[in-house]
């Protein structure tokens, strides 16, 4: 994990933005002179054009979301933004929670975090552009591989369409990797939206309904221990003294310390 310190002042500023709401996240920096590798899954043959997307050999479209789902529907919302411009149905994406990286900074906080109803307004244009640029590279690669003009091609839910033929995005990954974006691809006008602003199902609904969704409480790593905070019975009270002997004598207790 790549972490750096964030000042108390900066944390308070970020907290103020949320209007007293919860901020969950990590502080990261863009000041390092050494590029930090993207914290994405290493899959043979996969194309990772940016920090948010991967296209796998089987044409799985993997989206890394850098905002925490806390019931507010942000996973569906952010996948919808990138899916709109990439021309991939969000329900067909493999969506994963992103790791820590400077590319995932919430610009409203100056650090990687979720809160203050900021996810959509902070990343609306960014993720749409991510999708549009990736689609643009795929179309350019397809044009080269098929020997046709890019204007003769269209896309449809993860496929490049040429006449009556359909080719998966993954078919053009090898060529796309050699291309670069000189100018941002144009974004769709609102009149052409298929997913943004439309009624849709939640991308995580089935996982939650079947109990397969993973949350923080589900994390289990070797030699992991659990901590419990014993709070004062009244607000603002502070412990005058702590006798931890009895607690430490209980089975399973490793340590007791004051906060």
Which residues does each PLM region occupy?
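Cofactor-binding beta-sheet edge motifs in enzyme active sites
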Residues: 2-28, 32-259
